[in-house]
């Protein structure tokens, strides 16, 4: 997933 919130793990 590119540009998805699911890849937003900070």
From Swiss-Prot:
One of its GO terms (biological process) is proteolysis. It is found in: Secreted. This is Thrombin-like enzyme Cdc SI. One of its GO terms (cellular component) is extracellular region. Keywords: Blood coagulation cascade activating toxin, Disulfide bond, Fibrinogenolytic toxin, Hemostasis impairing toxin, Hydrolase, Protease, Secreted, Serine protease, Toxin. One of its GO terms (molecular function) is toxin activity. Negative results: does not induce myotoxicity or hemorrhage, when injected intramuscularly. Is not lethal when administered either intravenously or intraperitoneally into mice (maximum dose tested is 20 ug). Expressed by the venom gland. Strongly inhibited by PMSF. Not inhibited by EDTA, aprotinin, pepstatin, leupeptin, and bestatin. Monomer. The keyword Lyase does not apply. Its main location: secreted. Its EC number is 3.4.21.-. Belongs to the peptidase S1 family. Snake venom subfamily. Thrombin-like snake venom serine protease that coagulates human plasma and bovine fibrinogen by hydrolysis of the alpha chains (FGA) (minimum coagulation dose is 120 ug on fibrinogen). Has fibrinogenolytic activities, and degrades preferentially the Aalpha chain (FGA). Shows amidolytic activity toward N-benzoyl-L-Arg-p-nitroanilide, has a lower activity than Cdc SII. In vivo, intravenous injection induces defibrin(ogen)ation and a loss of the righting reflex and opisthotoxins, together with a typical gyroxin-like effect (18-20 minutes).
């Amino acid at each position: 997933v590119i540009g998805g919130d699911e890849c937003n793990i900070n």
